[in-house]
């Protein structure tokens, strides 16, 4: 490992050590939050080690967890819970924690060491698709989950608008100009990445104040748990009003993003790092942010997310990255720059020479790259391991929170092993860059386990998953879950969303999954297992609603054929069944709170102090999971969710509109006009986003009993 990288890791260790002086007490407090009264059966001890390490053993009726810091102690506790208590801890506060009546003993002492120093978590997008409405109640448990899984580098970008508000005021902007620059709360992740300004704004001042308070709570707890929060740095994104008031700046208009109506209204401005003003803004921001929140010297800066750079000239790219880093180092001499690599895969124009110029413009060891989507594209393989800069292997999993049955345990397990073997000494960590949380959680638990020298094969890990779902060892369940992983979750897909959650029409692309028959079989096998565990019930609902969505797709294909054949009778029969399937899926998803829209809406409205403010936040919440932007084309349904309220009040009415329009056309002897229907559909979608369509929530039922009824109805 080169000297620069060693220096980087040592600085992280020093920072963490300074922030966590009482690890045992911190771990005990976490155990009480997770275990309640059963926390008294667990004892924590601190040991010296140059690596993150924990041991487990039983002594005098207690489980003794010894580790080098509170983060490792939490990881040790989770290892005990998963492998001895058969208990999985969800990242959602409201999901139950189900423990055995008697906490089991550890028969033989276990010692496990970390193989990688960096364990990164989160994504700018997660702050829009899952986190915008959370309070300290949800965050406290979420941070506990991070610690339980060994996360020590969380992206921590809550509350940065308060910092920017103060900075832009110093540079002459007034309240209205600043708040109108910011987007609405659900869209701040993309505003922070310099994708667009102002959309769904202006941002309420009360929101900024409360987010500032929340960020202080978040950072305090993360630092107590030996984490290095990744704060924001200045990437070059400046308000249009700032450019107007400071003449002669060297800047450019960023390329359009997001297919908005009136795109110029939302277009971003990018200040060149070579302009003297860049370093002034960087220093002002870092100093103000440090005053507000402290610093751990790790900053996320992503200047070109899904937009073109000002130039692709290699010398200019090297100068640009050097300028960003030097401005950062001038404000904080210990600064490290964390950057995601997504845009270098996503955007055309980035070849190896250009990436090398950009990455090597920063001193070796001071730029840390997130290899963002490694289950599909491992960029370290095509960039000479990021040309020597430290990198983190990341599992992305989902786009927009579209809850497909995707959790490729085989690729995670084997690809990381291959990275250990071949990537070189600058392979520095693993991370999760998920866009949203409404997905299969267990793959992330395995991901972070791979940062440690955990014993066991891939099949043993799958067996452990079944044990956690059952709360016991059950060989029948183990086989079902091994099949679930191998035949469904591990199967590669070229898309990550379902037909139900996309706008209907005659010209839709083929989206039928290659695992449809396997899904039906495993759903049937799963409902015949016997468990009261919440995670098991969630799995039953998850695979069941996917089976229903695949059945809907089959019906749609037949409906299109019937339309082409002028078979009106068959169209009516199929159309009626399509509507019924959507209603049944809404009923099934209402069986588990993970699939409820009610929590999302109630949390959004809770941030408002008046009816007007509550409606403002709900409009943000509704739009981002439906239309997304303000146009009939572009990002619509990108963040579609299989939620009960969306199914009953959005997808079902929209699907019914399509069925009824097609039938009406055949009855009247005219051809169906797709463009006309899309416009009609968009009018309904906008009414939903503007709160003109009420959300109905189906009554909750028993998921296993309802699944048996639906299996008999659709799969026999």
What role is predicted for each listed range?
Residues 39, 88, 94-103, 122-126, ...:
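Catalytic-core regions of glycoside hydrolase
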Residues 1-22:
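Bacterial Sec-dependent N-terminal signal peptides
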Residues 75, 116-159:
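N-terminal structural segment of carbohydrate-active enzymes
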Residues 8, 20-21, 41, 49, ...:
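Coil residues (strongly favoring Ser/Thr
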Residues 643-716:
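Extended, compositionally biased alpha-helical segments that mediate assembly or anchoring
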Residues 21-116:
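Contiguous, structured surface segment used for ligand recognition
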């Amino acid at each position: 490992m080169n000297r620069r990288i060693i220096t980087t890791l040592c600085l992280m260790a020093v920072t963490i050590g300074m922030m966590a002086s009482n690890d045992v007490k911190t771990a005990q407090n976490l155990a009480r939050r997770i275990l309640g009264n059963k926390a008294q059966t667990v004892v924590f001890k601190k040991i010296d080690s140059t690596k993150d390490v924990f041991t487990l053993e039983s002594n005098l009726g207690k489980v003794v967890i010894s580790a080098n810091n509170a983060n490792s102690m939490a990881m040790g506790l989770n290892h005990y819970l998963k492998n001895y208590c058969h208990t999985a801890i969800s990242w959602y506060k409201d999901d139950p924690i189900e423990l055995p009546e008697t906490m089991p003993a550890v028969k033989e002492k276990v010692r496990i060491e970390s193989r990688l120093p960096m364990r990164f978590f989160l994504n700018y997008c997660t702050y829009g698709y899952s986190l915008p409405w959370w309070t300290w109640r949800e965050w406290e448990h979420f941070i506990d989950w991070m610690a339980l899984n060994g996360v020590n580098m969380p992206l921590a970008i809550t509350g940065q608008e308060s910092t920017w508000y103060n900075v832009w005021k110093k540079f002459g902007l007034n309240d209205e100009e600043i708040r109108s620059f910011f987007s609405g709360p659900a869209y701040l992740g993309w505003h922070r990445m310099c994708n667009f300004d102002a959309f769904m704004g202006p941002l309420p001042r009360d929101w900024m104040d409360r987010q500032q308070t929340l960020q202080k709570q978040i950072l305090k707890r993360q630092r107590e748990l030996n984490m290095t929060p990744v704060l924001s740095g200045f990437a070059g994104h400046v308000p249009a009003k700032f450019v107007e008031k400071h003449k002669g700046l060297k800047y450019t208009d960023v390329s359009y993003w997001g297919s908005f109506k009136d795109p110029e209204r939302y277009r971003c401005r990018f200040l060149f790092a070579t302009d003297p003003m860049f370093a002034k803004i960087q220093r002002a921001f870092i100093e103000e942010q440090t005053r507000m929140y402290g610093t751990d010297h790790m900053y996320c800066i992503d200047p070109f997310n899904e937009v073109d750079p000002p130039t692709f000239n290699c010398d200019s790219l090297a100068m640009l990255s050097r300028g960003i880093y030097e401005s950062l180092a001038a404000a904080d001499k210990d600064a490290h720059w964390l950057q995601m690599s997504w845009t270098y895969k996503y955007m055309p124009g980035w070849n190896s020479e250009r990436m090398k110029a950009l990455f090597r413009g920063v001193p070796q060891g001071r730029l840390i790259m997130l290899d963002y989507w490694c289950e599909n594209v491992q960029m370290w393989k095509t960039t000479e391991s990021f040309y020597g800069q430290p990198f983190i292997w990341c599992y992305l999993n989902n786009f927009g929170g579209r809850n497909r049955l995707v959790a490729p345990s085989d690729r995670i397990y084997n690809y990381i092993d291959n990275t250990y073997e071949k990537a070189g000494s600058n392979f520095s960590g693993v991370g999760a860059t998920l866009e949203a949380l409404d997905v299969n959680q267990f793959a992330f638990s395995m991901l972070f386990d791979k940062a440690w020298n955990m014993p066991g094969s891939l099949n043993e890990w799958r067996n452990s998953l079944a044990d956690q779902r059952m709360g016991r060892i059950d060989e029948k369940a183990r086989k079902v879950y091994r099949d679930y992983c191998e035949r469904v979750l591990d199967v590669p897909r070229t898309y990550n969303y379902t037909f139900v959650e996309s706008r209907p029409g005659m010209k839709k692309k083929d989206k039928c999954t290659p695992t449809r028959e396997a899904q039906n079989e495993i759903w049937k096998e799963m409902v015949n297992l016997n468990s009261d565990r919440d995670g098991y019930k969630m799995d039953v609902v998850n695979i069941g609603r996917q089976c229903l969505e695949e059945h809907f797709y089959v019906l749609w294909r037949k409906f299109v054929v019937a339309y082409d054949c002028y078979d009106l009778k068959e169209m009516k029969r199929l159309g009626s069944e399509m509507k019924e399937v959507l209603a049944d899926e809404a009923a099934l998803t209402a069986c588990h709170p993970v699939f409820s829209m009610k929590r999302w809406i109630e949390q959004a409205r809770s941030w408002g102090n008046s009816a007007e403010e509550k409606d403002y936040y709900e409009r943000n919440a509704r739009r981002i999971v439906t239309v997304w932007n303000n146009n009939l084309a572009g990002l619509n349904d990108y963040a579609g969710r299989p939620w009960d309220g969306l199914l009953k009040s959005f997808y079902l009415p929209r699907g019914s509109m399509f069925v009824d329009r097609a039938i009406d056309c055949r009855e009247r002897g005219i051809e169906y006009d797709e463009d006309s229907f899309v416009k009609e559909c968009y009018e309904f979608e906008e009414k939903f986003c503007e709160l003109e369509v009420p959300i109905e929530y189906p009554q909750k039922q028993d998921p296993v009993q309802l699944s048996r009824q639906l299996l008999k109805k659709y799969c026999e």
